[in-house]
Regions:
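A short beta-strand-loop structural module common to alpha/beta enzyme folds
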Residues: 38-48
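Cysteine-cluster motifs in flexible loop/terminal segments that predominantly coordinate metals
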Residues: 49-75
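Short, Lys/Arg-enriched N-terminal segments with co-localized hydrophobic residues
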Residues: 1-6
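Helix-loop-strand module that forms the ligand-binding subsite of alpha/beta enzymes
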Residues: 66-155
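N-terminal beta1-alpha1 ligand-phosphate binding loop
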Residues: 7-38
Length: 195
């Protein structure tokens, strides 16, 4: 995928709590991307209508999901972006239902053999993907299953894995006091936007 002069970085917010820790860190990451000269956009999944995958396999044939909801527009935004940064809290040792429904719907990009649909491959090849996780547990590795899911997706599909920022914050907004976490998120955004 040829890089534009101004990179486009898409932020995907997977928490239902706008203004919460995941949202604050995603804003930091997008500020870092913007500081590096990128055009940025944020999508809040909880404000979108996204149904779960029905495993009907129609997208394996056409590359287009038959479910007519907001994910169709998000697919277009993913294709247009040079990098995607996801931010999600840990809910019951995994990602939120909003993020899971979104990630499952990525199957529209693939054929039945889990290879890129040929018309998507040129637009997805080398696309950068990063992750921010926030958990209430002091042990940030509580988020390991989420990191594994996103990193494995990147490896399987030959996306460029930017890495994960893993943090801990128990109450809404607590992360604002964590200068290290904010800097790590900012730096992830800069990395996403640097050619």
């Amino acid at each position: 995928m040829g890089r534009r002069l101004n990179m486009k970085v898409l932020g995907i917010m997977g928490s239902p709590r706008v203004g919460g820790n995941s949202d604050i860190l995603l804003d930091e990451a997008l500020a870092g991307a913007k500081d590096a000269g990128a055009e940025v956009e944020k999508i809040i999944l909880d404000k979108k209508k996204i149904s779960g995958c029905k495993d009907c396999k129609k997208c394996n044939e056409t590359g287009i999901c038959v479910i007519k909801d907001d994910m169709l527009q998000i697919h277009k935004k993913i294709l247009e972006a040079d990098a995607i940064i996801h931010s999600v809290p840990v809910y019951f040792w995994t990602m939120t239902s909003q993020m899971k429904a979104y990630l499952d719907r990525w199957c529209a990009f693939f054929n039945a053999e889990w290879k890129w649909q040929k018309h998507y491959y040129p637009r997805m090849k080398g696309k950068r993907i990063g992750l921010i996780t926030v958990c209430g547990d002091p042990d940030v590795h509580t988020a390991d299953p989420i990191v594994h899911s996103f990193k494995s997706t990147a490896e399987l599909t030959k996306l460029s894995w930017l890495g994960a920022v893993m943090t801990s914050a128990a109450d809404k907004g607590d992360i604002i006091k964590d200068e290290m976490a904010k800097k790590q998120a900012f730096d992830l955004g800069k990395k996403a936007a640097t050619p």
